Amino acid sequence: FEVAVMQAVAKKLPQYEWKFTPTSDDDLLIGVESGKYTIGTKGIWKTPAREKKYIFPKNNIGASVIGLVIRKDEAATIKSIDDLAKTQGKLAPIAPQDARYNVIASYNTAHPDQKINLVSSENFHNSDAYTWVMEGRYDAYLEVELSYQNNIAKENAPYHRFADQLVYLRYKGIPTYALVNKKEVKLCEEVDKAIEELRKDGTIDKLEQKYFGESLQKYLNQK
C-alpha cells in the first residue's frame, strides 16, 4: 500500500529521479538517517526519538491498526482495551523503545483512574508473547493487526497453530508516515504537499480500499 502511495507521489514530483529499493526495517531506518536513502516508508510511526533523527511530512500516508491479542475464552470479558483496564488484566511486556509502548503510555495518561499496568522488557519475541497469552501468564498482547494477520491468521503464518485459540480486538489507528533524511527539507515539503493532494483527490482512499477493503482513516479518531 505505502509503496503504491509513494509511486503516486513520485508521479507528482517528476523533477526527481525515483528509485524504489526493497530492504529490511533496520536498513531503512539506518539508511535514511545516514543518507544512503533519501526517503523511506514501511508502516513508520512518528515518535519523539525518531523526530530527533529524521524529518516527517505533516500529512500521514496511511494508518496501522493496532489492538489486543487475547484468548478466545476471555472474549466474553475483554471486548476492548477499556475492558482490559477495568478488569486489571495483565498486558504482555513491551520494549520501551517500541512505538507500541507509547500507545499504552498515552492511554494511561488519558485514563489516570483506569490505567493498564505497563511492563517493559526487551528480551522476548512475538512468539513468546503469543505463547504467554495462550498459557494464561498474560491476558493480552498489544499487536499491529497486519502483524497478527501475517503471524497467526493466515493459513501459512508461522504461528497459525494458535489461530483457533486467539482473537484480535481492534483498538485504534496509528498514523504512518514517510521518513525523510534531515537534510532533505525541500523534498519533505514537496512530498507533504503531494500526499495532501492525493488524499484530497481520493487516490489514497482508493488505494486503502484496494489493499485493505476499507478506509483506515476512521480509526485515527479513536481515543
Predicted regions and their residues:
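Ligand-binding cleft/hinge of the Venus flytrap
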Residues: M6-Y16, D98-N123, Y130, I152-P158
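A ligand-binding cleft/hinge motif common to bilobed small-molecule-binding domains
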Residues: D27, E33, T41-K53, N102-S106, ...
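Periplasmic-binding protein-like
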Residues: G62-G67, A99-V103, E155-F212, E214-K223
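Short helix-initiation/N-cap motifs at beta->coil->alpha
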Residues: W18-I30, A76, N117-T131, E135
